UniProtKB/Swiss-Prot annotation:
Identification of the protein by name: LOB domain-containing protein 33
Tissue specificity field: Expressed in roots.
Signal peptide: none
Domain called LOB: residue spans: 6-108
Record-stated family: Belongs to the LOB domain-containing protein family.
Length: 177
């Protein structure tokens, strides 16, 4: 049951009494029922979501609720592509940055060849190779690991007591669309 005797966001949206066994209460707060749970209900249906959550082990329900909510909100914003649109945008950004690095590397090569005096940069091809490898490994390392060495998913899938709708990734979704 939601805190302070109030119903959870799902029960508020569905206009029913929230009891102790409510499968939605740990994941949908009362305050954002109209935005987050409304999208989940419209895209997937409350009955389907509750069945899926009940079939999962307790420790996986928070991750599933976050994923379902993210996908539902994405599908509401972009009915055709859903969350894949965000993935496409990030992929295009990586491709654009790789092209920019290649262009800047060729500019640096041209600069070093035009300045054939003794103090030129001798390691330009090595630098370009390092930069190319850095961008190709971007998704594997930089996106998945933050400065603390933790996986970025660890910051997203927090402890089960945190309300889903208060997570910063879901609050900042407008930034990406």
């Amino acid at each position: 049951m939601a805190s302070h005797g109030s119903s959870c966001g799902a029960c508020k949206f569905l206009r029913r009494k929230c009891n102790r066994d409510c499968v939605f209460s740990p994941y949908f707060s009362y305050e954002q029922a109209s935005s987050h749970f409304a999208a989940v209900h419209k895209v997937f249906g409350a009955s389907n979501v509750s069945k899926h959550l009940l079939h999962l082990p307790q420790h996986q329900r928070n991750i599933a609720a976050i994923t379902i909510s993210y996908e539902a909100l994405s599908r509401m914003r972009d009915p055709v592509y859903g969350c894949v649109a965000h993935i496409f945008a990030l992929h295009q950004q990586v491709v654009t940055l790789q092209e920019e690095i290649e262009f800047l590397g060729s500019q640096m090569k041209n600069f070093s060849y035009s300045n054939q005096n003794g103090s030129q940069l001798n390691n330009i091809p090595e630098f370009v190779n390092q930069m190319t490898m850095a961008t190709t490994n971007f998704v594997d390392e930089s996106v998945l690991n933050n400065a603390d060495g933790r996986n970025c998913y660890d910051g997203f899938f927090t402890n089960s007591e945190e309300m889903l709708v208060n997570h910063q990734w879901l609050q900042n979704m407008d930034y990406y669309y």
